[in-house]
Structure formats: C-alpha cells, structure tokens
Amino acid sequence: MTDLEEIRRKKMLELQQKAQQQAMEAEAQEQMRQQLEMQKKQIMMQILTPEARSRLANLRLTRPDFVEQIELQLIQLAQMGRVRSKITDEQLKELLKRVAGKKREIKISRK
C-alpha cells in the first residue's frame, strides 16, 4: 500500500467514527427529549382534568408554542406547590385569557 492509500484509509476511518459518534449523540438527545416529554405528560395528567387536557390538546394544533409556554407555567406552579387540586377547564380558560391578554395588539390606522 502506498502512503496516499494509507492516508485515505485513515481519513475514511476517522470520518466513519465521527459519523457513528454523531449518530449516537443524536439518538441520546432524542431519548432524553422523549423522556422529558413523558414526564411532562405525566405531570399534566396529575394536575389537569380530562376536559382541560382536551382543551390544551386542541389548542396545541393551532398554537403549539403558546401551549408549550402554558404547560411550563403549570408545571412550575405544581412544583412550587401552588396547585392544590386538579385544574378544571374553567380555571384553564381563565389562565389562557390572562396569558393571551398580555400579548400586544398592533393597530394600523389609515388616513
């Protein structure tokens, strides 16, 4: 084998090892994401009534980022011990109104 072939072979092995390592890291990240998602789902089942969960699921179809924000707030409240009983659909509606009310409205008036 010539020096050039040896260099090519080493470089190819290096690239294959890098690709394997990246694939393993991506798989580990995906598993971590799935595990966190399952934990979040379990917490939401503990703190929300079925109707409230259904409302969030429907809202997730149109505004996934907004629902993510609400879920994180609910989880934080639960972890701080501020959720005494399951949150009902009516309570969730009020929370959604308060959070959505913070959004700025931009009005354009034409002359």
From Swiss-Prot:
<dbReference type="GO" id="GO:0003677">
    <property type="term" value="F:DNA binding"/>
</dbReference>
<protein>
    <recommendedName>
        <fullName>DNA-binding protein MTH_1615</fullName>
    </recommendedName>
</protein>
<dbReference type="Pfam" id="PF01984">
    <property type="entry name" value="dsDNA_bind"/>
</dbReference>
<comment type="function">
    <text>DNA-binding protein which can interact with a randomly chosen 20-mer of double-stranded DNA.</text>
</comment>
<dbReference type="GO" id="GO:0005829">
    <property type="term" value="C:cytosol"/>
</dbReference>
<dbReference type="InterPro" id="IPR002836">
    <property type="entry name" value="PDCD5-like"/>
</dbReference>
<dbReference type="InterPro" id="IPR022889">
    <property type="entry name" value="DNA_bind_arc"/>
</dbReference>
<dbReference type="InterPro" id="IPR036883">
    <property type="entry name" value="PDCD5-like_sf"/>
</dbReference>
<comment type="similarity">
    <text>Belongs to the PDCD5 family.</text>
</comment>
<keyword id="KW-0238">DNA-binding</keyword>
